[in-house]
């Protein structure tokens, strides 16, 4: 893809799943990658796969809920890999103690709301605030946020998670609208059912069958499916695409 080779990107949430797949895809295209995650063991494993394949990457432990750790993520990237050209926000609290308790508005405790907002939404705000000034200084850059098909209102559960993802869609458009004329692109992807994201999805056979029927496809999503689209949106091949929120999950959300 055009404009990835020799560039530097931060994957904020690259220990597993879509984030790990994106980090590996970017490195495979010749980019240098910082794999940031609260799960530093997973981040280091991603980096090991990248470097073993001949790529360039570092692992940095950080927390989307901790502004100082995000600044450290940015500083470490610049010190080790050079100027930042793009950011992929993919982290979220998918733990059983948080997402597992996120049900309906009547039954979801406020501590789940606070935690979900702090990580899934404000975490993206924090990373954007930390990286955007560097992109503006260079006169160009790309941000790709991870949303969810649940932001479209089709999931009757996970009220807090889906609300934050709807807000991520608006944050994406806000950045594109305000800084597009200064060379900044910001887009988002809404993954369909991607295996490897949560253990719940791995085990729920009924959910998988429902998705296959709705998506009119022969298989479930893989991290590499999303990674290809995210890498494209970060690349110069997508320089005419800004402020868009793309659903990537078969044909279950066809639009005219």
Segments and roles (model prediction):
Residues 2-34:
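Canonical Rossmann dinucleotide-binding motif of NAD(H)/NADP(H)-dependent dehydrogenases/reductases
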Residues 85, 106-125, 144, 161, ...:
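Catalytic Tyr-X3-Lys loop
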Residues 128, 164, 172:
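Active-site helix of classical SDR
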Residues 153, 213, 231, 242-256:
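Short C-terminal tail/terminal secondary-structure segment
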Residues 148:
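Residue(s) in the substrate-gating loop at a strand-loop-helix junction
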């Amino acid at each position: 893809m055009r404009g990835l080779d020799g560039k530097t990107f931060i994957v904020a949430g690259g220990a597993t799943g879509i984030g790990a797949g994106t980090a590996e895809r970017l490195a495979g295209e010749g980019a240098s990658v910082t794999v940031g995650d609260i799960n530093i063991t997973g981040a280091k494993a991603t980096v090991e796969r990248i470097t073993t394949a001949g790529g360039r990457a570092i692992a940095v432990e950080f927390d989307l809920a901790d502004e100082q750790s995000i600044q450290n993520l940015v500083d470490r990237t610049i010190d080790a890999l050079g100027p930042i050209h793009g950011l992929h926000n993919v982290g979220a609290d998918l733990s059983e103690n948080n997402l597992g308790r996120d049900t309906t508005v009547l039954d979801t405790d406020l501590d789940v709301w606070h935690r979900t907002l702090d990580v899934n939404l404000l975490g993206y705000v924090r990373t954007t605030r930390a990286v955007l000034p560097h992109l503006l200084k260079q006169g160009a850059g790309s941000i790709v946020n991870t949303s969810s098909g649940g932001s479209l209102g089709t999931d009757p559960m996970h009220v807090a998670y889906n609300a934050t993802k709807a807000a991520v869609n608006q944050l994406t458009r806000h950045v594109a609208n305000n800084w597009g004329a200064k060379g900044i692109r910001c887009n988002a992807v809404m993954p369909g059912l991607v295996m490897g994201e949560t253990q719940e999805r791995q085990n729920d056979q009924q959910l998988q069958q429902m998705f296959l029927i709705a998506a009119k496809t022969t298989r479930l999503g893989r991290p590499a499916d999303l990674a290809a689209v995210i890498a494209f949106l970060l690349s110069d091949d997508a320089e005419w695409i800004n402020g868009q929120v793309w659903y990537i999950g078969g044909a279950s959300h066809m639009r005219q």
